Amino acid sequence: MSDNQELHVDNPSAADINVREDRRDFIKRSMVVMAAGAVAAAGATGQASASPAVAPVSRLKRKEAIGNTFDYLILGGGSAGAVLAARLSEDGKKSVLLVEAGPSFDPEQYPEELYSSNIIAANADPRYEWGYYALPDKQEQPVYTPRGKVIGGSSAINGAVACRALPYDFERITAKGLKGWSYEEVLPYFRKMETYHTGRDEIHGRNGPFPIHQLTMDYITPVQKAMVESSWKLGYAKVSDFNDPTANNGAGPNPMNIVNGVRVNTGMAYLSREVRERSNLTILSDALIDKLRFQGNRVQAALLADGREVFGKQVILSAGSYGTTAILLRSGVGPKADLAAMNIPLVKDAPVGTQLLDHAFYWMNFAARPELKGKEHPVVGAQVWTHSSFASSARELDIAVSPSHLLDPAISKTGVAFSLGLELMKVKSTGTVKLKSRDPKEAPVIQFNHLSDKDDMRRMVECFRLARKLARTEPLKSLIVEEIYPGPSVGDSDAQISEALAKGVGTLQHPCATARMGLASDPLAVVDGEGRVHGLQGLRIVDASIFPEIPLINLNPNVIMMAEKIADRIRGEEA
């Protein structure tokens, strides 16, 4: 796909052009709102960024990418990579090359599959989504595990729920001896990244590039509102801000990175037109990365699938938990025995891909009353986030239930359907990511092993019972005609619920921990606390793969925070 193509239309008709212009105007209006909010919020300090809606756009500097050595070579332009490219290129003396396997769009011209908050996983469009499947465990078929393939990465295809990790999560990290990762030390980067117009000033940012909008009870759907009210009736607390660590155990509307129905991804928020105009920033899109080339223990270059090479004094892998893992393995960084089986020369024996973590997920589907037809947006908008009886304390929020409107209504006899999504947040079961072959065009082999740990299953059984209890509690009860899946054939015994969960468990699309952060003495660690790969020179990893534990909530805002923090650290080292 060439840089100036927008919809892969060879000979656009007048209708095509009108659709494209309507899309552009819609995104532009939304981003003007986003930028105006940041300007208003920054007024007190006199600091405001130029609106990307009016900034000029330049052609991507492809020719500069090949043959030149950049100060920073960033491999992967997703939730972390786009942030790194924007922040590291703020230093005009440093050159930055961002390489992305998928397409690059003008920040105001993303296609509907990517900008619409009512579309998840880009409708499985292979132009923008990798199409990965994990091997089944007890499920009857492989598990679809979508990942974004575009500037913005999975932040362009996800549910846009913008919840931060808990202080409890960061205590688990610092308990491993990793310095700089306490809640108090990461809070400035959460604030730096966001524009958030509600909540307490001491915990929220007001003029960052990433807009987060706190939904209200008046905005969410009748089903979502009813589930929240049923949760309150059962005694769960009223939550007005899930990102407030003093008051987030309970039920309420979600914070979302959505403006006027536009899911704002990092390619929009961080790589604005103004940022892309920087003379020291080059973006190479539609460029599949094969592997890294080393001289001794120092990384020299990255080899693309078409045989070209790109060079950087510092190389940063930000290709996501699957992509980063596969690139490392093809490069000879991984378990020695696995590499030998693939005839890949060993560069570094490391536990890459051996400790995959992911939030297990299960759909409980319902037929809803027919008068709710047309009242199904936003498709995601609320949750009850709490602790099970198996949690170590009330601070360990290990389960959640979230109502959504993503089902095909044809499955319901009323023509209206919704789901209660069961989410396991505290995870012990580990999986793997391995190579199927040395071909970079071939998907890695993903094995989740969801609910294989007995504690995970116990927590998920309790989450299942909570969802059913909510469905049987007013006012949600009155909106339900019947439970479609798993249905009345699955009773309330542990055995029946466990069997249903094992057969139907899927992914919340939060893979992480395949190249874990840890001390050099930690046998499971691949990188140190700054993302530097142990035993190798010039190579960092900055994406969800380096989380040493899976946060008890969505990953995307936490990956963005991580990228902000490590970018700041890199710039500090260079100063």
Name these PLM-found stretches.
Residues M1-D25, S49:
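N-terminal secretory signal peptides
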